[in-house]
A protein has these predicted regions:
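Short, charge-patterned binding micro-sites
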Residues: 2-32, 65
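Core RNA-modification/binding signature centered on pseudouridine synthases
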Residues: 4-5, 104-201
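Short amphipathic beta-strand starts and helix->beta connectors
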Residues: 6-15, 57-66, 119-132
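Ordered, amphipathic secondary-structure segments that act as subunit-interaction surfaces
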Residues: 23-78
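Terminal, regulation- and interaction-focused segments at domain boundaries
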Residues: 27-30, 72-94, 98
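Helix N-cap motif at beta-to-alpha junctions
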Residues: 32-37, 84-87, 147
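Short amphipathic alpha-helices in soluble, non-transmembrane regions
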Residues: 39-48, 90-108, 157-158
């Protein structure tokens, strides 16, 4: 930006909550001049802190930005069951009986929760916001609505499920896998798929 206090124009797509890890985060920046995507990735990783690695860089057209194509619409997560709340490193397998309980939980006509907003608190049916899920041996997979129109956090889903089965105090750990937006056909795709790599001759 310009003015008396110039700074980088940058933002994060759906910033990650405290206590979560992630395999797929997105940073949106404006550049003053073109740069080759591979070179940009190499230069960023050379000065990055431990635990943060830039994987790729793509350019998104102004048309897609202007039409709202880059607005996030979904995220998917892994939910791990912990031995205790003291460490996220010691995990245990998902109980086999949870699979049947989860199917019963999702088969409800509605899944009503009290959801807080900045101004109020209201009862919301979160079932339509759960786009997909699967109980695996090592973790629970969740595919949830994310963004300005609808936003469902994985901890709210799991808190509601654990209350449903009477195990509210179960310690869990969350890892986000990726963030998605809708393409021109309305299909959910990773944000990266909306752009193209930059190649400078």
């Amino acid at each position: 930006s310009g003015g008396y206090s110039p700074h980088m124009i940058m933002s994060f797509a759906q910033p990650l909550g405290i206590g979560l890890t992630s395999d797929g985060e997105y940073l949106d920046i404006e550049l003053t001049e073109p740069i080759d995507s591979k070179e940009a990735v190499a230069r960023m990783n050379a000065v990055s802190v431990e635990g943060i690695e830039m994987v790729s860089m793509v350019q998104i057209s102004e048309e897609k930005k202007a039409s709202g194509m880059t607005i996030t619409a979904a995220s998917d997560y892994q939910v791990f069951l912990l031995e205790s709340g003291k460490s996220s490193d010691v995990r245990r397998k998902i109980p086999s009986e949870w699979k049947e309980s989860w199917e019963e939980f999702l088969s409800q006509e509605q899944i009503l929760v009290w959801k807080k907003t900045k101004k109020s608190e209201k009862e919301v049916d979160i079932k339509p916001m759960i786009y997909g899920s699967e109980i695996k041996e090592e973790y629970i997979y969740l595919y949830l609505a994310t963004g300005s129109e609808q936003n469902l956090k994985p901890d709210l889903v799991m808190e509601t499920f654990l209350k449903y089965i009477g195990q509210e105090d179960t310690p869990l750990f969350y890892n986000r896998l990726d963030v998605y937006a809708r393409d021109e056909a309305g299909k959910l795709v990773p944000l990266e798929a909306l752009g193209t790599p930059m190649v400078c001759s």
